[in-house]
């Protein structure tokens, strides 16, 4: 992306990651892949990736996340945090970060309520600050299990969230809106396929509609493929597509992001 790979001398330094490909947008941590145990107690998961390219130009990319989940009886308390730093020739290109606090209450084996709040900044997407708060209901619609060799699930979530965004004014035309505070609907669909407790494929689609303008909506689709190496370690391939129907004028309305790395769960 930053260099013509056929004409440059390339050196890769990878820390807990084999490849990190970034096209236009920010990688969003998909909470579906991080915690899959349904037992009381504390779980911790982490993802790290780093890529260094040197030659006619110097590019450094660092991505990270640290996440906690605590379950007691029917309640789940979760904290997600992470970010991404990109520099070229020792000049910062992007520095993004996020944190999310989430609470889930399990009504029964198929249904749960959820509440969350999230704070985010992203230089590529021009966010100085993005603050979210929402709640909703999640229902399992499909649950197919054949002994221990195959498991298929499909969940549907509905809810509402309040979204406050403050954009970087220095990059926008003088008269363009830089502050919004919108109420959006939440619609998400999560499908998962697990084979022999080794391979898991998760597809998640989020649709967020501004309640007072049908032309303003956001769509995110993410596919995660995890191959379990041992009890605590999985190889992860993520492909993410994001669409914003009304992006800032300096941005395109589509992002694509892919990552290959490792997920560590304790």
Q: What are these model-derived regions, one by one?
A:
Residues 151-231:
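Outer-membrane beta-barrel transmembrane domain signature
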Residues 254-266:
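Outer-membrane beta-barrel "beta-signal"
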Residues 90-184, 236:
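Outer-membrane pore/translocation modules
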Residues 48-50, 66, 79-83, 101, ...:
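Transmembrane beta-barrel strands of outer-membrane/channel proteins
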Residues 50-54, 72, 83-87, 119-123, ...:
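Transmembrane beta-strands of outer-membrane beta-barrel pores
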């Amino acid at each position: 992306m930053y260099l013509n790979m056929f004409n440059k001398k390339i050196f890769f330094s990878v820390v807990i990651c084999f490849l990190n490909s970034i096209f236009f947008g920010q990688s969003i941590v998909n909470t579906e892949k991080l915690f899959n145990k349904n037992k009381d107690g504390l779980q911790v998961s982490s993802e790290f990736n780093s890529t260094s390219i040197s030659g006619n130009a110097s590019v450094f990319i660092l991505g990270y996340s640290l996440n906690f989940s605590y379950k007691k009886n029917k309640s789940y308390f979760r904290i997600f945090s992470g970010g991404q730093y990109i520099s070229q020739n020792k000049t910062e290109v992007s520095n993004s970060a996020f944190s999310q606090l989430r609470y889930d209450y399990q009504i029964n084996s198929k249904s749960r309520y959820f509440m969350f709040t999230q704070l985010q900044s992203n230089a590529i997407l021009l966010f100085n600050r993005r603050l979210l708060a929402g709640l909703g209901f999640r229902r399992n619609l499909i649950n197919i299990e054949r002994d221990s060799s195959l498991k298929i699930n499909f969940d549907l979530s509905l809810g509402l969230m309040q979204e406050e965004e403050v954009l970087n004014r220095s990059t926008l035309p003088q008269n363009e809106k830089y502050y919004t505070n919108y109420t959006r609907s939440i619609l998400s669909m999560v499908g998962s396929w697990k084979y022999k407790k080794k391979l898991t494929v998760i597809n998640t689609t989020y649709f967020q509609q501004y309640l007072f303008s049908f032309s303003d909506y956001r769509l995110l689709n993410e596919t995660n493929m995890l191959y379990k190496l041992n009890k605590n370690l999985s190889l992860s391939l993520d492909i993410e597509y994001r669409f914003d129907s009304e992006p800032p004028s300096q941005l395109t309305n589509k992002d694509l992001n892919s990552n290959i790395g490792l997920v560590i769960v304790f």
